[in-house]
Amino acid sequence: MTRYQHLATLLAERIEQGLYRHGEKLPSVRSLSREHGVSISTVQQAYQTLETMKLITPQPRSGYFVAQRKAQPPVPPMTRPVQRPVEITQWDQVLDMLVAHSDSSIVPLSKSTPDVETPSLKPLWRELSRVVQHNLQTVLGYDLLAGQRVLREQIARLMLDSGSVVTADDIIITSGCHNSMSLALMAVCKPGDIVAVESPCYYGSMQMLRGMGVKVIEIPTDPETGISVEALELALEQWPIKGIILVPNCNNPLGFIMPDARKRAVLSLAQRHDIVIFEDDVYGELATEYPRPRTIHSWDIDGRVLLCSSFSKSIAPGLRVGWGAPGRYHDKLMHMKYAISSFNVPSTQMAAATFVLEGHYHRHIRRMRQNYQRNLALYTCWIREYFPCEICITRPKGGFLLWIELPEQVDMVCVARQLCRMKIQVAAGSIFSASGKYRNCLRINCALPLSETYREALKQIGEAVYRAME
């Protein structure tokens, strides 16, 4: 991000937060130049960017003023899915989207990919090079089945921040959170079982369940506080549910952080009905609050919570470093790993361990939390400007994803196909439902560095939505 883009993002965030109100005069070009230690031309470019976004308006000989803005869109209401076990219907649509990711000319707003070009990752790339040069025998040999111990020790220390007390022996390294969740599900479930999920739910989890022949029951979910405990309890009383998949911290796709009281209530239900909880904490480190939120796993006393996480969202997906803390299912998960995915790559594990050990990871996370928070604020500004007034939009408490609910008549599955022909890809809401619900919704990735390309893409998405409403 250039200096003027950084300044424009900062000012846009202040406007979004109400620090500069409608009609209020903004600081002069010279005063901003002095305050931020940048050139006058940098400030002028930043103001021009905000003017293009219609966040500010110039007045001759008077300076810049905050422009009149559309009203803040409401947060989507509690979801109301079909509350009975169903077979997952979303398959081809998800595969088509994943295949399209290989086209480098597409603006990838559908992928949940972090910013991997940030300077805070440079120590990791240097360490990767050093590991390969100086540990050739280890790098080219077989890994330990549980993964490199030095990495498991560092992960155990990281998990203390979320309230979980584990040792290196409790942790199994996997090839990402997706792999960890897949192994956890296979260790517990068999074809014909029923698993409860939040609604909407990350499509990757449902693809695993479909591949295993497992049915799903979607539970109503509040976009600000998470799954409905009452609805979950009712489902547990009615159906032989084997377990529940939850993303309680910086949820994908809704962005909420489940309050601690609700996390404990869900765990209490799991204990009472003797089911397992598959907890996905891959976004937990990216929470805007500090200290980071606790996991449900941190209150688990009988090993029924299988925690799955990775560095795919906090560092980079290409590392392929994930982990599981599967509690009472540890040995079974080890057997499943050996049978299905076997060993991991030692080099990326060793580099990641050093990255954490030397303090680079925490510095990187602090930077990314700030960057993603700014991005979410600016993307929200763009969406408010270019989309219809009738939308609802989430207010994520971390991570880098936005969920947008459009008017009922908008079919985002059809709109997404049109956008794909325009080289813009979004994730239509229907892939986040077992039964194809949420066709009038979409998820947007806000992690990528801010640029005119993404602003123009959001403008074109808004125009396509307007056309769909005609």
Language-model regions: role of each:
Residues 432-436:
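AMP-binding (ANL) adenylation modules
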Residues 1-130, 334, 338-345, 366, ...:
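N-terminal basic, amphipathic alpha-helical segments
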Residues 305-385, 392-394:
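PLP-dependent aminotransferase class I/II
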Residues 275, 305, 391, 424:
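Short, conserved active-site loop motifs that form the nucleotide-linked donor/cofactor pocket
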Residues 133-273, 278, 284-299, 372, ...:
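Conserved core of the PLP fold type I
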Residues 8, 12, 182, 186, ...:
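Amphipathic, non-transmembrane alpha-helical secondary structure
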Residues 57-58, 166, 426:
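Short beta-strand "wing" residues that participate in macromolecule-binding interfaces
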